[in-house]
Amino acid sequence: ENQKQIQLQICQKGSADESVTRGVQAEQIVSSNSSIEYWLFQFIPKASKMEQIIRQATECGIKNIVPVIGEYSQKNNVLAMESSKKDRFLRIVREARQQSGSPVETTILDAVSLKEAISLWNEETLDDGEKAAVVLWECCEQTKTVHEVLSKSDIKKVAIVVGSEGGISPSEIQELSLNGFVPIHFDTNILRCET
């Protein structure tokens, strides 16, 4: 009853009224065969941007989304994350999985401090040789390329840290760097937090 139906028309010589009907529910999607599990540590932006981030991260196959309370996160945005938004976020995940056909069951964890986020990553992950952690940074000093960081062939888990609208503070970058997160910078672009 709730199944989305899509009508596709076959474009070939023959009967013009031949068609295929397709419908997918998130529960019907087969588990991911990907050998890499992705985590997104997102510093808390405005609520509307967080919804867009959750949708796009789910469509891309992110396994865990961890909202991080950072120095540049505005207090009202943090409060919005901790309030009744959880049900809305779960609905967004379900809809994004249906739309994209993503086989990854995305989980949104509770908002945590930066120290808690680092501890979570270190506790939940494997040996250093089997994981990689990057932080997208708008400054280009002492950064590496994505290829340099992710070129190891035995990586099983990847953490991606993204700042809020104000970015990530220098002290937070230092804390992340000291704990194995490698700052990366795209030479030609500074991306918005929701991109």
Task: List each language-model region with its residue ranges.
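A mid-sequence, solvent-exposed acidic-amphipathic segment
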Residues: V112-V161
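A C-terminal functional module that forms or caps the active site or interfaces directly
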Residues: I155-E175
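Short Gly/Pro-enriched loop/turn and capping motifs at secondary-structure junctions
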Residues: C139-T143, E165-S169, I190-L191
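Short acidic/polar active-site loop segments enriched in Thr and Asp
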Residues: K63-N64, K156, V182
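N-terminal positively charged helical leader segments and presequences
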Residues: E1-I29
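RNA substrate-binding interface of SAM-dependent RNA methyltransferases
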Residues: V30-A132
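Structured adenosyl-cofactor binding patch, chiefly the S-adenosyl-L-methionine
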Residues: S169-T195
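Short amphipathic alpha-helical segments
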Residues: L79, H147-E148, E172-E175
